[in-house]
Amino acid sequence: MTTATEVQIVEARKEHIPFVAWVVMAANRSHLPKGMWDINVGGSEEDVLRYLEVLADTEQLHWAHYSLFKVAEVDGVPAAGMCGFFENELGPVSMMAGAAEVNQKIGRTPEDIAAGWERSKSIMGIIMEHEPGAWVVEHVATKPEFRRRGLVERLVHEMLEMGRKRGATTADIGVLIGNDPAQRAYEKCGFRVVIEKRDAEFERVYGSPGARMLRRAL
């Protein structure tokens, strides 16, 4: 006999911060062993998650802040998450301000900050430009034990509806080259590749040739 599972899509709350930190770490890793935060922060996975938990709860809003996330819960257990935002509201300046807040809170030295940037800066070679007013869907990840249940599709539907209500007419989402399952999932939701960027230094450091941006109308 099987029991039915209950799936709920909820706005992230304070108690979701550890899960949001994991989502940000996992989304940045994509299909690779390490992502930007692993390389920038350094240390163990616990060190990275600790940093991202503080980042998720800064005074400054940015695209890794817990309040921007929606979470899919399966029988009350956080299983998948993603966020959405307008770049003109919460672009790179907001993230830099949030990171500065974290660095101060955890006592990261200027030398540590500079070394982390030196290790991770090749990420700039694949940064995408978004159309004005595009709703940016970011930081998408599902816990391994909850994959293949359609949670990403449900979250994307909710996140796109939020973008429509905010007045967006297009939505963008990114994927690293080589993460074919993620790209297929986004294409299933109506996204199509519009830009591809490759960078040799990014590939040397991270292990992927580059990234693709997908877009769809809302």
Task: Set out the residue ranges of the language-model regions.
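A short beta-loop-alpha structural element at the N-terminal edge
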Residues: 8-22, 29-35, 87
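Conserved GNAT-fold acetyl-CoA-binding loop/helix
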Residues: 30-56, 98, 102-111
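Conserved GNAT acetyl-CoA-binding A-motif
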Residues: 134-135, 163-174
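Conserved acyl-donor/pantetheine-binding loop and adjacent beta-alpha core of acyl/acetyltransferases
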Residues: 88-134
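Conserved acetyl-CoA-binding loop-helix of GNAT-fold acetyltransferases
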Residues: 148-161, 184-188
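C-terminal "cap" of GNAT-fold acetyltransferases
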Residues: 169-172, 176-183, 189, 199-218
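Conserved beta-strand in the GNAT
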Residues: 71, 77-85, 136, 141
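Active-site rim helix/loop that mediates acceptor-substrate recognition in acyltransferases
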Residues: 42-69, 73-74, 121-127
